[in-house]
């Protein structure tokens, strides 16, 4: 997705949420008391549930948001098939004072057709309740103790995050097109997945995703990054930019890979943003991507 479209996507996410989701009352409020067992956060996109307080485990059904203070999950947080979790709010929008946050001690599990929007910062993705999304200042840093795993999700949009284990996305994505679908349709945005400005304690493994656009940007990865057989409609995908990878960077069978970002509304010109790789680069991520139309790869490393 070119720079303009990514910026527009962020703005429409923010404006749609502020105008609609934030204004609606919750259907199910997973409240502030400490709750053992499994809590269900449920609602609709027009009247989402609200997750706050401390819970043993959480299942999201329908639509749920984290915008009413601190939410702590001691076990796993599961986004059930076709559901959406919006956890990219910086403020406590229910009381009007304080901040919101999300800390999951176990795994975050995103099921088929579901969407996760988690984390935000001024530079990459404005918080959904930032009062000035054109010049954002707020941030929210979610943490996941174990893995972030998704199987056939619609989209995974995470920023400014920490995952203690692996990040694994397998399949899904809404197809090789840029047509808004599911919750993305509400935001007038193409379906996409991106992982930006985060720390990952294990591997990043993304495979068999078919979507519009994908990014892996400014991650600190303690082990290996594998991008395998991902097909994206946007020629600007997959952007793999400015990551610090302790292990290997392996890219095979993808529609295209870039270690440079587009500067304007077109595919070229591009700004090189190479990765730091501790071990080996393999497959499509060995030499730097072309800097001009029809140009060669290299000579520098990807």
Give the label of every model feature segment.
Residues 39-43, 62, 118, 125, ...:
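Extracellular secreted precursors and ectodomains with disulfide-bonded cysteine-rich loops/domains
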Residues 113, 153, 181-190, 197-199, ...:
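Repeat-based scaffolding regions
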Residues 63-68, 90-99, 131-137, 154-157, ...:
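Short aromatic-glycine motifs in intrinsically disordered, low-complexity regions
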Residues 237-302:
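Leucine-rich solenoid repeat scaffolds
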Residues 33-82, 301-302:
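N-terminal segments that cap or nucleate solenoid repeat domains
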Residues 1-33:
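Secretory targeting and sorting signals
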Residues 84-99, 115-143, 168-195, 256-260, ...:
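Acidic/polar low-complexity surface segments
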Residues 61, 67-69, 74, 80, ...:
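Feature marks extracellular polysaccharide-active and adherence modules
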């Amino acid at each position: 997705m070119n720079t303009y479209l990514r910026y527009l996507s962020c703005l429409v996410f923010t404006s749609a949420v502020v105008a609609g989701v934030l204004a609606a009352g919750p259907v199910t409020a997973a409240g502030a008391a400490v709750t053992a067992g499994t809590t269900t956060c449920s609602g609709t996109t027009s009247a989402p549930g609200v997750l706050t307080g401390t819970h043993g485990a959480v299942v999201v059904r329908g639509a749920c948001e984290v915008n009413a203070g601190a939410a702590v999950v001691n076990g796993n947080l599961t986004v059930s098939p076709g559901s959406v979790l919006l956890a990219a709010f910086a403020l406590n929008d229910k009381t009007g004072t304080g901040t919101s946050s999300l800390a999951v001690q176990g795994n975050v599990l995103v099921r088929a057709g579901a969407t996760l929007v988690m984390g935000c910062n001024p530079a990459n993705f404005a918080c959904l309740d930032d009062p000035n999304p054109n010049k954002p200042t707020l941030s929210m840093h979610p943490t996941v103790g174990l893995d972030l795993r998704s199987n056939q999700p619609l989209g995974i949009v995470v920023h400014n995050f920490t995952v203690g284990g692996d990040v694994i996305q397998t399949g899904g994505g809404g197809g090789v097109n840029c047509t808004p679908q599911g919750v993305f349709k509400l935001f007038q945005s193409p379906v996409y997945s991106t992982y930006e400005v985060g720390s990952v304690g294990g591997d990043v493994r993304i495979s068999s995703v078919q979507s519009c656009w994908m990014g892996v940007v400014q991650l600190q990865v303690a082990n290996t990054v594998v991008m395998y057989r991902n097909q994206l409609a946007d020629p600007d995908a997959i952007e793999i930019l400015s990551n610090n990878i302790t292990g290997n960077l392996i890219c095979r069978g993808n529609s295209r890979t870039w270690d440079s970002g587009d500067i304007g509304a077109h595919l070229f010109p591009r700004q090189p943003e190479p990765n730091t790789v501790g071990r080996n680069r393999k497959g499509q991520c060995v030499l730097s991507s072309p800097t001009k139309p029809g140009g060669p790869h290299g000579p520098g490393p990807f």
